[in-house]
Amino acid sequence: MVVLVEQKYQELLNMLPSVSRETMENLIQFESLIIQWNAHINLISAATVPFLWTRHILDSAQIYPLYSQCLHWCDLGSGGGFPAIVIAIFLKEKQKGHIDLIESNGKKVAFLRTVIAQLNLPATVYHCRIEDVYQKINAPEIITARGLASLNTLLQLTFPWLKQKTIALLQKGRDYAIEVENAYANWRFNLLKHQSKIDENSVILEISHVRSCQG
């Protein structure tokens, strides 16, 4: 077990060289909570549980260094906490910053709040739909979403923020180019593509300065 944890720590350090032992311990605790709760509610696919560390935790961790200087994050459709809880753990180490989690499923909300309480994370969960969150929180610096909806739908949902100064970091799979092309039918935006460090077929789309083609 100790050897396995050290191996995981080295994998994390390869991505974020200055991660503390305490942060690593929080990530391991989060991993354990996912496995424990996943037996009762569907947080992640059962087929991916053996690859939880790489497929979900490291995949989420690569988001944070892109804008580690930012202090107000918001994750949409947080589900099992990827990437939101991982980002919250890094913000905890930084000792400043906050992330808001938006989730409509009550059971997943209960899980997320349990993790946040047990790990004492700088995060707040809002049990609501994305469309309703704009009345609850101020515009964040960064929006994240992982496997939530098509790019066109995400831009529609988040336009109230993205038309301002908010930046979106959206994790997408092999069909991302098609999603971008479809989105251009309705939107104009600045786009920067970051290749995933975990999956060669995946990317992180950095989107800003969104404008509607409909005026």
Curated annotation (Swiss-Prot):
EC number: 2.1.1.170
Superkingdom, taxonomy of origin: Bacteria
GO molecular function terms listed in the Swiss-Prot or TrEMBL record: rRNA (guanine-N7-)-methyltransferase activity
UniProt main location, coarse: cytoplasm
InterPro entries linked: rRNA_ssu_MeTfrase_G, SAM-dependent_MTases_sf
Residues binding S-adenosyl-L-methionine: 77, 82, 130-131, 146
Keywords in alphabetical order: Cytoplasm, Methyltransferase, rRNA processing, S-adenosyl-L-methionine, Transferase
Gene Ontology CC terms: cytosol
One Pfam family in the UniProt entry: GidB
Annotated catalysed reactions: guanosine(527) in 16S rRNA + S-adenosyl-L-methionine = N(7)-methylguanosine(527) in 16S rRNA + S-adenosyl-L-homocysteine
Location in or out of the cell: Cytoplasm
Family classification: Belongs to the methyltransferase superfamily. RNA methyltransferase RsmG family.
Role this protein plays: Specifically methylates the N7 position of guanine in position 527 of 16S rRNA.
Name of the protein: Ribosomal RNA small subunit methyltransferase G
The species this protein was found in: Bartonella bacilliformis (strain ATCC 35685 / KC583 / Herrer 020/F12,63)
